[in-house]
């Protein structure tokens, strides 16, 4: 069975012979009103700078989706773990958007893999905040990443509202594509992800490929999956003046420049870009990002590699960039390279293309959706350095003249299909479907006391997909 796309009508065969007809569910979905949403992002704050620590595309997704939901008149509260004593309990980001910094465990010294021990404390903080409101304050809970999902289904049960979950990444997928030096995801995460998949009322994924992974690995119900592409801020990321951007970054007008943007860790494979560029005389590379995850073990490792390759004078290291500064980097370079071993979508690829900059990307995960091979960039199968050097060289050569202008225009046009407005439409469709299904489910329980006593999906299952 194919997963349902957000916006497609269909409510499942389970409504037959239980007192609630499919037409009833469709009507409940159409009538569903989303007024207030609780977003859960335990392990990383939407206010953190992408490219540092665990902050990346998910942070952008959570913040931008909240801002755009608020523009539709929906109140959004984002719950994240406080990581410093100076973090205020509540931050009003914009009209209709609050970030609640929940104290759960020590502020420092914990990484993502320590956080399962603090989920009870985090859940208590979330429930305590909700208790200050009138009953029924939130209409829906949307959890991001498996840690948040663990809190999400507890909140769902307490508040009697549906849970929508976005995994962003899956342990089994990451473990199947480990880079040298990367630590595998622990079994605890695999078990936790299975629990959340079983408990969530709806599952939102970035691509059809991710939906297939959820179905094959975690036996997710295809009828509960909605495909929602992330968006890009087309006001910030849009074509700009290359020479002006190069002047600001101290780059020569005529030189060929490649950029790597992201967290510096084995999973993102920045070393592949350096090794490939080392084979291309005269090509400069900009690396924008900070060490993260396994990369923290050797924070200067990439600079040392540049020295070993003899290209240190051709490499410019920049700290993680603000959105406006990142757009300037994209304007300045000839192409952006994304050689990740695993990538659920690849938001950087879309942001670069929105600026009219073509992309060379690994043909993994969601990148074949984010990049149109041969139109807005080039996809590379595998991580062979010679193949990457050839792909980068080929795109640099084709960028010259009229062909380059055509690809730049095609890149911007492709990226424009990933607007946050489209993403918000799809999110709301998924939310309404979740509310409709959830309401119908509660009516079934009222009409069928035996069904109300049936075990939870998770407790009824045997084994965990891996």
UniProtKB/Swiss-Prot annotation:
One of its GO terms (molecular function) is magnesium ion binding. UDP-N-acetyl-alpha-D-glucosamine binds at residues 49-50, 57, 263, 268, 321, 343, 351. Residues 1-22, 446-466 are annotated as: Disordered. Pfam families: Glyco_trans_4_4 (PF13579), Glycos_transf_1 (PF00534). It is an enzyme of class 2 (transferase). Residues 1-12 have a biased composition (Low complexity). Keywords: Glycosyltransferase, Magnesium, Metal-binding, Transferase. Gene3D superfamilies: Glycogen Phosphorylase B. 1D-myo-inositol 3-phosphate binds at residues 43, 54-59, 112, 145, 169, 189. Mg(2+) binds at residues 330-331, 333, 357. GO terms for biological process: mycothiol biosynthetic process. It catalyses: 1D-myo-inositol 3-phosphate + UDP-N-acetyl-alpha-D-glucosamine = 1D-myo-inositol 2-acetamido-2-deoxy-alpha-D-glucopyranoside 3-phosphate + UDP + H(+). InterPro entries: Glyco_trans_1, Glyco_trans_4-like_N, Mycothiol_biosynthesis_MshA. Its EC number is 2.4.1.250. Catalyzes the transfer of a N-acetyl-glucosamine moiety to 1D-myo-inositol 3-phosphate to produce 1D-myo-inositol 2-acetamido-2-deoxy-glucopyranoside 3-phosphate in the mycothiol biosynthesis pathway. Belongs to the glycosyltransferase group 1 family. MshA subfamily. Homodimer. This is D-inositol 3-phosphate glycosyltransferase. It comes from Mycobacterium marinum (strain ATCC BAA-535 / M).
């Amino acid at each position: 069975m194919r997963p349902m796309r957000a916006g497609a009508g269909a409510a499942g065969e389970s409504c037959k012979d239980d007192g609630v007809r499919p037409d009833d569910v469709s009507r409940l979905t159409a009538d569903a009103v989303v007024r207030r949403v609780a977003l859960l992002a335990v392990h990383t704050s939407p206010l953190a700078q992408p490219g540092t620590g665990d902050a990346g595309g998910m942070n952008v997704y959570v913040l931008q989706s909240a801002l755009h939901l608020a523009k539709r008149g929906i109140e959004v509260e984002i719950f994240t773990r406080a990581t410093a004593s100076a973090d205020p309990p509540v931050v009003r980001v914009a009209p209709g958007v609050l970030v609640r910094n929940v104290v759960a465990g020590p502020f420092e010294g914990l990484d993502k893999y320590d956080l399962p021990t603090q989920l009870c404390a985090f859940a208590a903080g979330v429930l305590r905040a909700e208790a200050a409101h009138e009953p029924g304050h939130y209409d829906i809970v949307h959890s991001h990443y498996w840690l948040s999902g663990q809190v999400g289904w507890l909140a769902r049960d307490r508040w009697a509202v549906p849970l929508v979950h976005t995994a962003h990444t899956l342990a089994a997928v990451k473990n199947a594509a480990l880079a040298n030096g990367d630590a595998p995801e622990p079994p605890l995460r695999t078990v936790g992800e299975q629990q959340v998949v079983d408990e969530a009322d709806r599952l939102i994924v970035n691509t059809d490929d991710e939906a297939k992974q959820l179905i094959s690995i975690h036996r997710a119900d295809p009828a509960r999956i909605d495909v929602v592409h992330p968006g890009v801020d087309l006001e910030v990321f849009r074509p700009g003046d290359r020479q002006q951007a190069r002047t600001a970054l101290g780059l020569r007008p005529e030189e060929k420049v490649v950029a790597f943007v992201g967290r510096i860790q084995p999973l993102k494979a920045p070393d592949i870009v350096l090794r490939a560029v080392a084979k291309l005389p005269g090509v400069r590379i900009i690396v924008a990002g900070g060490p993260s995850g396994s990369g923290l073990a050797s924070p200067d490792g990439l600079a040392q590699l540049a020295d070993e390759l003899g290209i240190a004078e051709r490499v410019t290291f920049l700290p993680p960039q603000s959105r406006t500064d990142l757009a300037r980097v994209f304007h300045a370079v000839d192409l952006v390279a994304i050689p990740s071993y695993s990538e659920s979508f690849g938001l950087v690829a879309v942001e670069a293309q929105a600026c009219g900059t073509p992309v060379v990307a690994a043909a993994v995960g969601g990148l074949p959706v984010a990049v149109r091979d041969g139109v807005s960039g080039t996809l590379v199968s595998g991580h062979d350095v010679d193949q990457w050097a050839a792909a980068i060289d080929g795109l640099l050569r084709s960028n010259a003249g009229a062909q380059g202008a055509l690809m730049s225009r095609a890149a911007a046009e492709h990226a424009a299909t990933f607007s946050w407005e489209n993403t918000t439409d799809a999110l709301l469709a998924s939310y309404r479907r979740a509310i409709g299904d959830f309401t119908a489910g509660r009516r079934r329980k009222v009409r069928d006391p035996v069904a109300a006593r049936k075990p939870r999906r998770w407790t009824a299952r045997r084994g965990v997909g891996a």
